[in-house]
Swiss-Prot record:
Keywords: Activator, DNA-binding, Ethylene signaling pathway, Nucleus, Transcription, Transcription regulation. It holds the Pfam family AP2. Residues 79-91 have a biased composition (Low complexity). Belongs to the AP2/ERF transcription factor family. ERF subfamily. It comes from the Eukaryota. The lineage of its organism: Eukaryota, Viridiplantae, Streptophyta, Embryophyta, Tracheophyta. Promotes cuticle formation by inducing the expression of enzymes involved in wax biosynthesis. Confers drought resistance. Acts as a transcriptional activator. Binds to the GCC-box pathogenesis-related promoter element. May be involved in the regulation of gene expression by stress factors and by components of stress signal transduction pathways. This is Ethylene-responsive transcription factor WIN1. Residues 60-91 are annotated as: Disordered. InterPro entries: AP2/ERF_dom, AP2/ERF_dom_sf, AP2/ERF_ERF_subfamily, DNA-bd_dom_sf. Expressed in aerial organs, mostly in flowers, and in roots. Also observed at the branch points of pedicels of most young flowers, and in a patchy pattern in roots of mature plants and very young leaves in the rosette, including support cells of their trichomes. Residues 6-63 bind DNA.
Amino acid sequence: MVQTKKFRGVRQRHWGSWVAEIRHPLLKRRIWLGTFETAEEAARAYDEAAVLMSGRNAKTNFPLNNNNTGETSEGKTDISASSTMSSSTSSSSLSSILSAKLRKCCKSPSPSLTCLRLDTASSHIGVWQKRAGSKSDSSWVMTVELGPASSSQETTSKASQDAILAPTTEVEIGGSREEVLDEEEKVALQMIEELLNTN
């Protein structure tokens, strides 16, 4: 009942079994990884899920290169070699189960961080998106080219700014997410317009 080791993403139930769960960084939700006999098994499940979600730079309980050799984070080796052999043979099945759980949790379009960003190098302002996962990438969803600042542009009305912004936007629209992006596009243009009006 007394917990001797503390692993990330692992806790012990009152009746002695160990459970693992991981928090998705972008969805702000907990993903249930399962119930395990030992804390080490639960910690390894957490490690695999963390690597699947965040790539090789994920915070794990065990070193990534020694993940299946039986070494713990303190450098001590496990007593039972048979448990490490069974964990290495079942790691591929565990990995597929964890991938399925992560896909089930993320049924919505791929999780991402979206923000308004100013690119001073190329004089653009726009909506920038960073995707989560091991194959994470970042890209501009929509950009608006900023022209040279002049006193006549500062006094333009809101209607003329709409006319300026409309033809210069570049939008990447993916298949079935058109309606969602249309709403996001409206919000992004409104945010860009408000930023341009405040300057």
